[in-house]
Amino acid sequence: MYRGRFAPTPSGPLHLGSLVAAVGSYLDAKAHRGEWLVRIEDVDKPRAVPGAADTILTQLEAHGLEWDGSVLYQSQRDSVYQHQLNQLENAQRLYQCDCSRRAIRARSDHYDGYCRNRQPRSTPYALRFINNNPVDTFNDRAHGLLEDHSASVSEDFVLKRRDGLYAYQLAVVVDDIEQGITDIVRGSDLITPSFWQLTLWQYFTGKQPRMMHLPLIMNDDGLKLSKQNHAPSIESSQARNNLFTALDYLGIKPESELRHSPVSEILQQALQSWCKKWHIAGR
């Protein structure tokens, strides 16, 4: 059974770019008669803004994006991530690294495995995954075959940070596997970390989820629309207009008379268009 998810970081309310990812992942799940889960990716606790998670959920509801099951919060799952690290340590797939970013940059444009065969001389330290079998190619439903044979893809990447926080790469894969995610639909800015994540998927399960990376929305300066670049939040009171704009970026144009219809009707027509666009049968 198809199971997808939308996994925002609660560093602020949803903006148009994150709405595009939410709508795309929602439509794809419903087109496949699957489930659409919501996960709050607050593993990076200092980035989480108080109240932002609740605001995001309210915004999703206002736009007719109803999720299946209960919402998962990464900030409540430290013991799960630590257990997985313990398993990796027992399998001798981790090592300690006390290299600073400055030290790494001074040696190379990627992490060179400097600490793999030595004990760190000081604390704190990060934990790196011994990346013996990197995944450097995968098929993307929107982009076709994607390849990255650069040294950064095959480097030993961090699973627990020097500040003691669990790395996003670990948390997202552990959660996806535990939740039974079969399909990941998200923005194209996450293509690069996909290679590390698929490496972990392959190590943990021997298989990979289907991937689909959606187009990004750029601002007037040519930068990705994001909270970091001060993208304005969407207004729930403008849900119909927001959906029309998001769907336009996804290559879907609902009939203009639907601008005054309930959001459920807009999404229903968008669902039919999504099936046609991506050649999904059965709707």
From Swiss-Prot:
A motif ('HIGH' region) lies at residues 8-18. Keywords: Aminoacyl-tRNA synthetase, ATP-binding, Ligase, Metal-binding, Nucleotide-binding, Zinc. Its cofactor is Zn(2+). Its EC number is 6.1.1.-. L-glutamate binds at residues 5-9, 41, 168, 186. Zn(2+) binds at residues 97, 99, 111, 115. GO terms for molecular function: ATP binding; glutamate-tRNA ligase activity; zinc ion binding. A motif ('KMSKS' region) lies at residues 224-228. Binds 1 zinc ion per subunit. ATP binds at residue 227. GO terms for biological process: glutamyl-tRNA aminoacylation; tRNA modification. It is an enzyme of class 6 (ligase). InterPro entries: Glu-Q_tRNA(Asp)_Synthase, Glu/Gln-tRNA-synth, Glu/Gln-tRNA-synth_Ib_cat-dom, GluQ/Sye, Rossmann-like_a/b/a_fold. One of its GO terms (cellular component) is cytosol. Gene3D superfamilies: HUPs. Transmembrane segments: none annotated. Catalyzes the tRNA-independent activation of glutamate in presence of ATP and the subsequent transfer of glutamate onto a tRNA(Asp). Glutamate is transferred on the 2-amino-5-(4,5-dihydroxy-2-cyclopenten-1-yl) moiety of the queuosine in the wobble position of the QUC anticodon. Belongs to the class-I aminoacyl-tRNA synthetase family. GluQ subfamily. NCBIfam families: PRK05710.1-3, queuosine_YadB. This is Glutamyl-Q tRNA(Asp) synthetase. It comes from Idiomarina loihiensis (strain ATCC BAA-735 / DSM 15497 / L2-TR). The gene is gluQ.
